[in-house]
């Protein structure tokens, strides 16, 4: 299979491992070649019948959303992370905006977002983002970002600027943020977020602690739980949320234990979906979880006291996020 690059969009060029340039965005093999954990290509498991991806139909809002994003120099995690639900979500006029650029300072080998030395923050981004959301008349948005370990606050102030500007230009819009872990700067980041807390606070644990070194190099399971718990302590009325992906080698009991940890740290909502390998250079899928197993996790989530659980093969962190938030009392 060959891949054609669009010369009109140089930001999507992929640097080769042999000619490493930290200012260029590395994806796929160029990205994973330099992580401490070696990704060994494996024979791909055959996708089962319950894995279905909906393509956007010509004439849907899919193309309108993409055009508006390009006009305002904005990125979505839907595109950058190759989300399988992009057709459905763009088609109905929803998107998860990715701020602070499209180059992440981490190299997680499950993720399709590019790695590289990030560009300076765009001072116009909060304004451009807010104007776009107002123009699209969106009632609910999710704002996420790449990891910005190069910034003293991890990007917390930029999140607050975006939240503030959105509320100024589109007061009807409810805002969920999906934040990085702010590792090494958590206290500073939480203090800054106090100035403009979101309507929903989301931070994904992604996988079980045993697999962190392999799947999330540079991250720490207990630190991520601490982030969620400390934010909740500061803002008890703001729902908190976290997500997991299945298929990296975890066991069902390990997933249930992580769910218990989430509840012990006052996480209100949970998403659980199937990991899909973006390329042969990313971590392989070691199992496709059967719908009956997803149904079991959903039952267990409600039994544990989660206010809402979105669980299924194609579920992603911000999939139907507006419906999840409404179920948790965000109006």
Swiss-Prot record:
Binds 2 [4Fe-4S] clusters per subunit. One cluster is coordinated with 3 cysteines and an exchangeable S-adenosyl-L-methionine. GO terms for molecular function: 4 iron, 4 sulfur cluster binding; lipoate synthase activity; metal ion binding. Residues 1-32 are annotated as: Disordered. Keywords: 4Fe-4S, Cytoplasm, Iron, Iron-sulfur, Metal-binding, S-adenosyl-L-methionine, Transferase. Its cofactor is [4Fe-4S] cluster. Pathway: Protein modification; protein lipoylation via endogenous pathway; protein N(6)-(lipoyl)lysine from octanoyl-[acyl-carrier-protein]: step 2/2. NCBIfam families: lipA, PRK05481.1, PRK12928.1. This is Lipoyl synthase. It comes from Bordetella avium (strain 197N). The gene is lipA.
């Amino acid at each position: 299979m060959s891949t054609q690059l669009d010369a009109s969009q140089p930001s999507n060029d992929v640097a080769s491992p042999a000619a490493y340039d930290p200012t260029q965005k590395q994806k796929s093999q160029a990205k994973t070649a330099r992580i401490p954990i070696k990704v060994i290509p494996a024979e791909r498991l055959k996708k089962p019948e319950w894995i279905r991806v909906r393509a956007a139909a010509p004439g849907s809002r899919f193309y309108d959303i993409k055009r508006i994003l390009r006009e305002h120099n904005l990125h979505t995690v839907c595109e950058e992370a190759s989300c399988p639900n992009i057709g459905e979500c763009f088609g109905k006029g929803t998107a998860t905006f990715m701020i602070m650029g499209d180059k992440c300072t981490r190299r997680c080998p499950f993720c399709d977002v590019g790695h590289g030395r990030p560009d300076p923050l765009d001072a116009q981004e909060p304004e451009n983002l807010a104007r776009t959301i107002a123009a699209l008349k969106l009632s609910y948005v999710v704002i996420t970002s790449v990891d910005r370990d190069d910034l003293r606050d991890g990007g917390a102030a930029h999140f607050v600027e975006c939240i503030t500007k959105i509320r100024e230009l589109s007061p009807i819009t409810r805002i969920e943020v999906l934040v990085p872990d702010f590792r090494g700067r958590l206290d500073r980041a939480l203090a800054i977020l106090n100035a403009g807390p979101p309507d929903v606070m989301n931070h994904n644990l992604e996988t079980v602690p045993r697999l962190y070194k392999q799947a999330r190099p540079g991250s720490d399971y207990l630190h991520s739980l601490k982030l969620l718990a400390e934010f909740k302590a500061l803002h008890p009325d703001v729902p908190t949320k976290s997500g997991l992906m299945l298929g990296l080698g975890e066991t069902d009991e390990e997933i249930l234990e992580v769910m218990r940890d989430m509840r012990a740290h006052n996480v209100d909502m949970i998403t659980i979906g199937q990991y899909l390998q973006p390329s042969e250079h990313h971590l392989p899928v070691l199992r496709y979880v059967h719908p009956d197993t997803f149904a079991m996790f959903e039952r267990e989530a409600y039994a544990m006291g989660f206010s809402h659980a979105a669980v299924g093969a194609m579920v992603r962190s911000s999939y139907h996020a507006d419906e999840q938030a409404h179920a948790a009392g965000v109006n």
